[in-house]
């Protein structure tokens, strides 16, 4: 299986590259594809035609996101949306990673996928918006 993995210099992306060695891996770094540029994302996916897209890449500077909301939303909302659109176009699975920052932390139990979101800051809002965009597109 040919798997395209974004953010391979990050903790999760790097770990995936180490663990999925039985597959043909296409590791994408910031230098390979600027996630603020939708056309670059489309081009990379079209070029490699993967069987699966895994997106652990994210804007993760929680505090700095308050000062750079546009950048946070470009990377955490817009980029995953483009990836989900391409995955749907190619009829392939798309795996995207969430964060606990999509919740407000007021629940006294463990959060689950179906819990209502209520992000308090820009980082959580941008990640939540990305998830909503992916859900609207649907797919595998």
Predicted regions and their residues:
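Adenosine-cofactor binding site in Rossmann-like domains, unifying the SAM/SAH pocket
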Residues: 21-43
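SDR active-site strand-loop-helix element
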Residues: 6, 28, 53-57, 94-99
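Catalytic helix-loop patch of NAD(P)-dependent Rossmann-fold dehydrogenases
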Residues: 74, 78-82, 102-140
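NAD(P)H-binding glycine-rich loop region in Rossmannoid oxidoreductase-like domains
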Residues: 39-75
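Helix C-cap/helix->beta junction micro-motif
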Residues: 48, 86-90, 137
């Amino acid at each position: 299986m040919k798997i395209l993995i974004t953010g391979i210099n990050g903790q999760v992306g790097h770990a995936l590259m180490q663990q999925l060695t039985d597959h043909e891996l296409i590791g994408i770094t910031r230098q390979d594809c600027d996630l603020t540029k939708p056309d670059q994302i489309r081009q990379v996916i079209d070029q490699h035609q993967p069987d699966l897209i895994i997106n652990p890449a994210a804007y993760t500077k929680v505090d700095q996101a308050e000062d750079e909301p546009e950048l946070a939303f470009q990377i955490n909302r817009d980029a995953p949306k483009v990836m989900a659109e391409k995955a749907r176009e190619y009829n392939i699975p798309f795996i995207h990673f969430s964060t606990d920052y999509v919740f407000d932390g007021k629940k006294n139990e463990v959060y689950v996928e179906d819990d209502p979101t209520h992000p308090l800051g820009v980082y959580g809002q941008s990640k939540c918006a990305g998830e909503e965009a992916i859900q609207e597109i649907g797919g595998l």
